[in-house]
Amino acid sequence: MVLGRGSLCLRSLSVLGAACARRGLGQALLGLSLCHTDFRKNLTVQQDMMKIELLPALTDNYMYLIIDEDTQEAAVVDPVQPQKVIETVKKHRVKLTTVLTTHHHWDHAGGNEKLVKLEPGLKVYGGDDRIGALTHKVTHLSTLEVGSLSVKCLSTPCHTSGHICYFVSKPGSSEPSAVFTGDTLFVAGCGKFYEGTADEMYKALLEVLGRLPPDTKVICGHEYTVNNLKFARHVEPGNTAVQEKLAWAKEKNAIGEPTVPSTLAEEFTYNPFMRVKEKTVQQHAGETDPVTTMRAIRREKDQFKVPRD
């Protein structure tokens, strides 16, 4: 990430926010953390069936407004800054009906209560009773609709025990679908194992998300791409896909543009956590089994000192 005005604030809050995400202290920091994201640009992913507005939040989070083009009904993913969501809803002149919460950490679910006060009657979905303002608890393969869009809930426990990813598609459409992965799968990375194991993350990445169509758009919860790719380069220094993606991501960061979305097919070429079956990744980890490789490279990533280049 390029840090300009307020860079000290951003660095401090990035570290502090990660700790608070699992300690329940986020609400006390929410107002402070808006200091801020205005150097990061919104992005609209436009398709015939749906429009997805990427909304930067806090220091490196993303919220997402999903608009069904047929009905102009909308859902929002992880609305930690409710006022920004409301402004975007008004800009697009759509009807917000649904909140999709990936997990209970404050930087994802911390805006739910305020949003439902601003917009009474919202349906709030999630897989964990710790999620604020929850109205509909979902489990693996639960389904719901947003206008004419179909949403399938995918249980991916590990970062948190109740983590849900949301696979959004349009029945009968040939356009690529999208999966909102929260803190399970990032561009070139994955979430920390706060409440789970390497085996659970392996299943989440390879057996649940990895079996979705290859052209599925991966839409994640944070802008971590450059740092993730620097670790991927460390794991596989000879991987040209990593090198090319890193150069591209640095250019995007330099002008404040998102590196999201990627696709599942792309993730299998440069994401070391999706590549734990590859010999190059296993050799780096000193392992021969994908799950123990997952455990080893996650531990290494947790201690990795990101180079400044």
Curated annotation (Swiss-Prot):
Which residues are the transit peptide here? Answer: 1-24
- Which residues are recorded as binding Zn(2+) 2? 107-108, 183, 222
Q: State the Pfam families in the record.
A: HAGH_C (PF16123), Lactamase_B (PF00753)
* Family according to the record: Belongs to the metallo-beta-lactamase superfamily. Glyoxalase II family.
Q: Which organism is it from?
A: Rattus norvegicus (Rat)
Q: Which cofactor does it need?
A: Zn(2+)
Query: Gene symbol?
Result: Hagh
* E.C. number: 3.1.2.6
In this chain, Zn(2+) 1 is annotated as bound at 103, 105, 159, 183
Catalytic function, reaction form: an S-(2-hydroxyacyl)glutathione + H2O = a 2-hydroxy carboxylate + glutathione + H(+); (R)-S-lactoylglutathione + H2O = (R)-lactate + glutathione + H(+)
What function is annotated for this protein? Thiolesterase that catalyzes the hydrolysis of S-D-lactoyl-glutathione to form glutathione and D-lactic acid.
Entry GO terms, CC: mitochondrial matrix; mitochondrion
The record's account of tissue expression is: Strongly expressed in testis, skeletal muscle and heart. Weakly expressed in placenta, pancreas, spleen and peripheral blood leukocytes.
Keywords assigned by UniProt, alphabetized:
Acetylation, Cytoplasm, Hydrolase, Metal-binding, Mitochondrion, Transit peptide, Zinc
Q: Write down how the cofactor binds this protein.
A: Binds 2 Zn(2+) ions per subunit.
Q: Which domain of life is it from?
A: Eukaryota
N6-succinyllysine occurs at 230
User: Which residues of the sequence carry a binding annotation for substrate?
Assistant: 192-194, 222-224, 298-301
- Record-linked InterPro entries: Clx_II_MBL (IPR035680), HAGH_C (IPR032282), Hydroxyacylglutathione_Hdrlase (IPR017782), Metallo-B-lactamas (IPR001279), RibonucZ/Hydroxyglut_hydro (IPR036866)
Q: In which pathway does it act?
A: Secondary metabolite metabolism; methylglyoxal degradation; (R)-lactate from methylglyoxal: step 2/2
Residue(s) carrying N6-acetyllysine: 90, 117, 230
The protein, known as: Hydroxyacylglutathione hydrolase, mitochondrial
Assembly notes: Monomer.
Instruction: Write out the GO MF terms.
Output: hydroxyacylglutathione hydrolase activity; metal ion binding
Q: A GO BP term, please?
A: methylglyoxal catabolic process to D-lactate via S-lactoyl-glutathione
